Amino acid sequence: ETAELNMSYENVAIDYIDHVAILKLNAPEVLNALSPNMVQELSSAITDIIRSDARCLLITGEGRAFCAGANLQPKGAADGLPPAGSVLETHYHPVMTKLRNMEIPMVSAVNGPAVGVGMSFAVMADIVVAARSAYFLQAFANIGLVPDGGATHLLPRIIGWRRAVELSMLAERLPAETALDWGLVNRVVDDDKLMEEALGLAARLANGPRSLGL
């Protein structure tokens, strides 16, 4: 049984299939780059999911990208915006913490590029399934920034300090197959099989004991 799509958001969408909540980044025209408005919607959507009877969260992106990173200056934004670091601290990082602290398992279906903070969103999940065409990128070094969104905490713990430094300092694309070899993702599947695989895993977790989410 599938619930109706939640239409109260502009930049994210929530759907429910049985006890699996599907949270989709829904701004394909900007490759699902996370604007402050989208992050606010994400926070509200996560609250909705926490209040629901969902037993597992599946997160993915609409269109050809999972998430192109943080869009700190969305189109039409006025001058005089606060510094990027301040925006990250007040908008982005609290949502990352909120996701991380959810008491249900999380699966990510990485349908395309996962860049910058979008990479952190992808790999913070308990189970990460990537499309074969997907890639991961920490591009901060190219613009003189340190990795954000929890990457400096997550990456060394998942793939080890040496490879985390390589990703951060060289800012090279990491193809899905290499990410699998490195232990960054759990499974790589053909693009047209991604949601089937991810939903199958999410349903399995949703039907498991609640202790899986703790």
Region spans (language model):
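Short, hydrophobic secondary-structure boundary micro-motifs
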Residues: 33, 68, 213-214
